[in-house]
Amino acid sequence: MKHNLLFLIFVFTSLVSVAQSEKAVKWNYAVKKLADKTYEVSMTANISGDYHMYAQNVGVDGPAPTIFTFTKNPLTILDGSVKEVGKVVKKFESVWGGNVNYYEKTVNFVQIVKLKANVKTSLSGKVEFMVCDEKQCLPPSTVDIKVNIGG
């Protein structure tokens, strides 16, 4: 019985922590047509409070980097990798034993997508990220992405 209670407390605490990290970052998406069959997909993270979100290239082992994974779509071609647009902070963090790269308040991630034909489709996938403040880190979170393009 004692083990069941401890397990339930652990599960509840984990669920609350994941919910906190999803509230710490709000995602907005926008699509801009660059040329015929070429689109710029912007994925903007608005980071609340004193939290910071780690970059795609964190700089050290330890904190979870931001990772975008897109679902294969036979109608699209990803042109290059996701680019970060924002003011990166490079700071030594003793807990990680080195210099880390992260963003405060906001960062925009940009992916260029080319369509194989003039059709309406979507860019789908997920983004995994981790946020911390000066006192704590929240568990890594995963948010689904679905952005309509073309047409």
State each model region's role.
Residues Q20-G151:
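Extracellular/lumen-exposed scaffold segments
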Residues M1-K23:
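Bacterial Sec-dependent N-terminal signal peptides
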